[in-house]
Amino acid sequence: MKKVTAMLFSMAVGLNAVSMAAKAKASEEQETDVLLIGGGIMSATLGTYLRELEPEWSMTMVERLEGVAQESSNGWNNAGTGHSALMELNYTPQNADGSISIEKAVAINEAFQISRQFWAHQVERGVLRTPRSFINTVPHMSFVWGEDNVNFLRARYAALQQSSLFRGMRYSEDHAQIKEWAPLVMEGRDPQQKVAATRTEIGTDVNYGEITRQLIASLQKKSNFSLQLSSEVRALKRNDDNTWTVTVADLKNGTAQNIRAKFVFIGAGGAALKLLQESGIPEAKDYAGFPVGGQFLVSENPDVVNHHLAKVYGKASVGAPPMSVPHIDTRVLDGKRVVLFGPFATFSTKFLKNGSLWDLMSSTTTSNVMPMMHVGLDNFDLVKYLVSQVMLSEEDRFEALKEYYPQAKKEDWRLWQAGQRVQIIKRDADKGGVLRLGTEVVSDQQGTIAALLGASPGASTAAPIMLDLLEKVFGDRVSSPQWQATLKAIVPSYGRKLNGDVAATERELQYTSEVLGLKYDKPQAADSTPKPQLKPQPVQKEVADIAL
C-alpha cells in the first residue's frame, strides 16, 4: 500500500512539475505591437500594409499549422479567380422589370483593381517576385444556353458597357466564334443549341498561396517580425490598459506562452469566429457561422489542359444559390497548368479543412443559436440544395461536367476536396437571423482587436478589405498626412473611384499589367448585339447565397 501511495505521490509531483513548467513558460510574456493570428493572405496583407505605414512597429504572426498558406489561401483550396465580375453572373442580378443591376459588379471590379495595384506596388518594392509565379492572364468568359439565359446575357453585356471598368468585353452568339474562344466547351455540342458568351481578355488566374508565402517571407526579413508556426491560440484576455494577453500553445512541445499585444487581428479563416467569441467583446454576440465545403473535378491530362485557356462561368440553376454557379477553369498552380470544374458543395461540421468536427457545435452559443435556427427555417431551398449536393454520385458530377465539356472522359478527371468556407450568420432585428454573403470586419469600440469573418469574394479582395480594416481601426492615423501619402503610394487610386473615368481606368490597368506581366490592349469598340428583350421576371423566392 505504501508503495502504491508513494508511486501516486511521485506521479502527482511529476504532473504538478509539468503543469508548473507550462505555467512558468506561459508567464514568460512576449510583447508586440501587432499580433496577427493566422498565416493566410489576410494577415499577410495587413502585415505588409503596416510594415510600410509603421516600419518601427513590432509584429508577431502565429499559425496553427506547420506552414503558412495551408488552409483557404492554398492554391488547391480555392478557385484561384481574380474576382472582378467580368464573368460571374451572380454579381449582376436581374430586376423584376428585366433590367440588369450592375452596382455590385462595379464594386467588385473596383475592389480587384485595388488588389492589382497593391500587388504591383509590392513587385516594384521587391516584396513580391516573379509575377508569373502568382498571377497569369487567363481570359474570363460567361457562357449560357437557352433562350431566356441568352437574353439575360445580352442584357448584362449591354448594361456593363455603361462602366469604364468593363470596356473591352466581347459578346457572341456564334458557335464558331465561341469555339475559337473556348474549343473544349463547344466541341461535341448540338449545333442547334442556342448559346451565348462574353469574353474579357484581361481576366486573371491567381495563386493566393504563393502571394501569401512571398509576403510573409519578406516580413520575416525584418528583425521586429516574428513568425511562430505550430502555435495555437488558446485564450484572449483584455487587460486594464486595453492591451490583450493572448495565450499561445506550442503544439510540438506542449508548452504555452503569453503574448501581450496592443492590437490583435484575427485572420484565421474559419477559426476566426471561435476566436472572436473567445475574446468576449460584445460585438461577437451578433454572429454565428455555418460551414460549407467545396469539391472540384481536376484534370492534368495535357490533351485537356492544352485545349482550354479560359475561366468559363455559367449561370446557377433555379433554386440554387447564385454563387454556386458551375465553372470550368484554367489554373496555373506551382508553374503547372491544370483544369478544374466545379464547385460541388460538401458538408462537414469542421470550420477548417484541418479543423475539428466539434467546430460548429463549440461555436454555437445562447446568443447565436436563435439566429441560426431562423436562417435554417427561412432558407429551406438552400437546405434542399446542400442535401442534393451531398447526395451527388460520381456519375452525377460527371454529367454536370459534360454540360460544359461535352466530350469529357471520366478517366481524365479526379475529385479534389478544396477548403471550408464558413458562411456568416448575423442577428437581424426583423428576421431573427440572416445569411450574409461576403466578408465583414468585426472590431471592438476601442479599435484594439478586429476579426475578418466570411468567405467571398475573399482573397481576391484582400487588399481593399484590409484597407477597410485600417480605416475602421486606425481611423485617426489613416487621416494623417503621413499615412495618406503612403497609402496613395501603395494604391494610386486610393480615395477615388475608377468607374466612370475612362482615362484613369486605362492608366491603372496599363500600369498594373506592365508590372505584373499581364496582357492588356486598349479596348476596341463594343460588339453589336441583338437588342435584349426586357421581360418582366416571374416572382421567385430568393435563395440565400453562399460561398463555395
UniProtKB/Swiss-Prot annotation:
Disulphide bridges: none
Class of enzymatic activity (EC top level): oxidoreductase
Annotated stretches, region: Disordered: 521-548
Catalytic activity: (S)-malate + a quinone = a quinol + oxaloacetate
One Pfam family it belongs to: Mqo
Top-level taxonomic group: Bacteria
UniProt keyword annotation of Oxidoreductase present: yes
Cofactor(s) essential for the protein: FAD
Keyword annotations: FAD, Flavoprotein, Oxidoreductase, Tricarboxylic acid cycle
Chain intervals with Low complexity compositional bias: 530-541
EC number: 1.1.5.4
GO molecular function, one term: 2-hydroxyglutarate dehydrogenase activity
One BP annotation, GO: tricarboxylic acid cycle
Pathway: Carbohydrate metabolism; tricarboxylic acid cycle; oxaloacetate from (S)-malate (quinone route): step 1/1
Family that this chain belongs to: Belongs to the MQO family.
NCBIfam families membership: mal_quin_oxido, PRK05257.1-1, PRK05257.1-4, PRK05257.2-1, PRK05257.2-4, PRK05257.3-2, PRK13339.1
Protein name: Probable malate:quinone oxidoreductase
Organism of provenance: Shigella sonnei (strain Ss046)
Lineage: Bacteria, Pseudomonadati, Pseudomonadota, Gammaproteobacteria, Enterobacterales
Name of the gene this protein is made from: mqo
